[in-house]
């Protein structure tokens, strides 16, 4: 009788007349106005592969532990495979009344295979289920971003090889500072993105522990084998505390932070592309494929896509802050606020995948205007530091040398010329330490070649650095290749 009573009231009528899976305790359905408001299905349906993988692993473990029969486990696995294939093919209709991806799949499974589908949720709560789905999703998203990161770094390294003899002004405060190799400049970004790869891997690792078995918050009385489930899903281990398992979203914050730093690096690079492609700089010419025009000004060729990448950094930062603010006041354990944790992560990952791809395309198709860069090296007194070093190496304290050269620069400003344009007699009047070989200190290629310290811009130093960058890239590709048993994101729910 109790069994029949449970079956009779297992479902609860929802606002649309259909049934909710959690309805045994309720006498009335949800208000119609809350149906869409409370549903997460439009977002978490994108985790359908993760949800199905988690359910298959859970059912397999239940059968291994003798909690459900082998026949039920087989029916569940086959039913879930059929649902996944239908979603992949775009032949599955998601119903907002199912509330979330878990109920959507479970209700369809029960419709297809009957009684066995109702046993799937034994020993499991949606709390540990959604935490598992989300962790699997973060691993998949981090892996996708790591791959895009590697592709962009290949483009940067290839460009650094190509432009290893091109010199341009280096800037501080957006003022001419010292000359550097373009390859040196590009490798600076390569190292930034290399650090981003490390942060993405850290986010992957933070998500790489399984919450299944924590149930609602306190664990379960069923003899679950959590290690088996974790291994089936490719997790490194299990989360040791059931409260933490269902309420932790630090791993999502790690993904958001890694993504925010990537966005910041992309934005900085985009800003330079915008500047360099302007008429005032003319250092690069963007491909037509990565530019747009004006609806009124026929002459315009705008770096819209670099500007968009720069602009999208704010969007990515916003997603990080949104989750931080959501989490800051939540008591243990699960709270419905956590339903707001996935949309931002999916948006950040999608946004950055586009940005990384577009950036790689822009750099690989741009034209570097070496003449414009060389011409700009002839203004702004880029040799000033080396002239001061010239005096310091001949015994004059550097601070005094700094003052002498500062006076020479002021003289140039008043005359409207550059340091190399001053007659030798002017140098000798400024300091008797100047000799005819001062011309070497004024030669831009010689200045660059002299920067031989480790990490410097001299061609020899950059060649060493380039080798290190390639070695780091190869090592990170090995790390990427080791990321096995990741449940990849599905695209059938788009």
Task: List each model region and its residues.
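Acidic, glycine-rich loop-and-beta core segments that form the ion-binding/anion-interacting portion
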Residues: 234-325
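Glycine-rich cofactor/substrate-binding loops
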Residues: 18-54, 115-116, 297-494
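Short amphipathic alpha-helical segments with heptad-repeat character
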Residues: 135, 139-146, 150, 157, ...
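A helix-coil-helix interface module used to build multimeric assemblies
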Residues: 15-219, 224-231, 292-293, 304, ...
């Amino acid at each position: 009788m109790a069994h029949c009573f449970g079956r009779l009231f297992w479902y609860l009528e929802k606002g649309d007349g259909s049934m909710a899976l959690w309805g045994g305790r309720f006498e009335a359905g949800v208000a119609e106005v809350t149906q869409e408001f409370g549903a997460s299905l439009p977002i978490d349906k994108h985790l359908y592969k993760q949800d199905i993988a988690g359910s298959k692993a859970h059912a397999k473990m239940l059968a291994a532990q003798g909690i459900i029969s082998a026949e039920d486990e087989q029916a569940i696995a086959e039913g879930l495979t059929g649902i996944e294939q239908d979603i992949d093919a775009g032949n599955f209709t998601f119903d907002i009344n199912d509330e979330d991806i878990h109920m959507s799949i479970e209700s369809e499974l029960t419709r297809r295979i009957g009684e066995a589908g109702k046993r799937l949720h034994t020993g499991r709560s949606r709390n540990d289920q959604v935490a598992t789905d989300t962790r699997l999703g973060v691993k998949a998203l981090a892996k996708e971003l790591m791959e895009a990161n590697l592709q962009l770094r290949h483009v940067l390294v290839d460009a650094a090889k190509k432009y290893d003899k091109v010199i341009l002004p280096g800037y501080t405060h957006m003022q001419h500072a010292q000359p550097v190799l373009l390859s040196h400049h590009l490798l600076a970004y390569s190292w930034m993105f290399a650090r981003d790869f490390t942060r993405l891997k850290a986010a992957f690792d933070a998500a790489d522990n399984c919450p299944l078995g924590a149930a609602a918050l306190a664990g379960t009385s069923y003899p679950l084998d959590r290690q088996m489930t974790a291994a089936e899903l490719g997790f490194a281990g299990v989360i040791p505390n059931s409260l933490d398992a269902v309420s932790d979203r630090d791993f999502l914050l790690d993904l958001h932070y890694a993504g925010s730093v990537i966005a910041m690096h992309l934005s900085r690079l985009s800003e330079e592309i915008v500047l360099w492609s302007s008429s005032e700089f003319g250092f690069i010419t963007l491909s037509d494929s990565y530019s747009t025009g004006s609806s009124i000004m026929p002459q315009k060729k705008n770096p819209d896509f670099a500007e968009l990448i720069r602009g999208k950094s704010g969007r990515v930062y916003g997603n990080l802050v949104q989750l931080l603010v959501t989490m800051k006041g939540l008591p243990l354990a699960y709270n419905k606020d956590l339903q707001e944790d996935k949309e931002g992560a999916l948006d950040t990952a999608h946004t950055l995948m586009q940005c990384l791809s577009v950036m790689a395309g822009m750099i690989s198709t741009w034209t570097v205007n070496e003449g414009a860069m060389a011409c700009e090296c002839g203004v702004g007194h880029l040799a000033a530091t080396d002239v001061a070093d010239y005096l310091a190496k001949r015994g004059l304290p550097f601070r005094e040398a700094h003052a002498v050269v500062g006076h020479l620069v002021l003289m140039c400003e008043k005359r409207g010329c550059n340091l190399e344009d001053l007659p030798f007699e002017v140098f000798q009047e400024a300091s008797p330490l100047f000799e005819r070989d001062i011309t070497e200190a004024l030669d831009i290629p010689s200045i660059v070649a002299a920067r031989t310290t480790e990490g410097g811009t001299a061609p020899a130093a950059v060649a060493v650095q380039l080798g290190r960058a390639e070695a780091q890239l190869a090592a990170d590709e090995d790390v990427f290749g080791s990321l096995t048993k990741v449940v990849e994101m599905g695209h059938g729910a788009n």
